[in-house]
A protein has these predicted regions:
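Acidic, low-complexity terminal tails and accessory targeting/binding regions
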Residues: 9-20, 62-70, 85-133
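A generic alpha-helix propensity feature with a strong bias for hydrophobic helices
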Residues: 42-44, 58, 104
Length: 133
């Protein structure tokens, strides 16, 4: 199921371009200098992105728990993971500290979700061709 609210940040005019292509772009340089907190031209701010992610993420967790699910798997971009974990995961970490491995993610425990709206980090995972699913 595709959840629109969990899509990666809208990078506006930066979309589809890499840092080498933009290394002399004044808008890009200003955005990086602001720690990527300012809005991308025609795109989202990190704050708006994080708020969108957290609304969709919490709704998914609420629904899964209400439906009696014991396992919820969300496959998402790294920025999406970082935004949700910065808000909801324990131990508390900064957005950028939640940057996981490529093809990786996190296993979380929702035991305290209903009362405290937090998820406990169980482990970090990284999938490879050899990973046994």
């Amino acid at each position: 199921v595709v959840v629109d609210g969990l899509k990666e940040m809208c990078f506006g005019s930066f979309e589809g371009r890499n840092y080498i292509e933009m290394e002399h772009d004044p808008d890009y340089l200003a955005w990086v200098a602001a720690n990527c907190e300012s809005p991308c031209p025609d795109g989202e701010t990190k704050a708006a992105f994080s708020e969108r992610i957290c609304r969709a993420f919490s709704a998914l967790v609420d629904k899964a728990l209400a439906d009696g699910e014991e396992l919820l798997v969300i496959l998402a971009h790294g920025g999406t993971q970082m935004a949700a974990l910065e808000r909801y995961a324990l131990p508390h970490k900064d957005y950028y500290e939640w940057c996981g491995p490529n093809a990786g993610g996190f296993v979380l425990d929702a035991a305290d979700w209903a009362d405290k709206r937090v998820l406990h980090l169980v482990k970090t995972v990284q999938y490879t061709r050899e990973t046994d699913v």
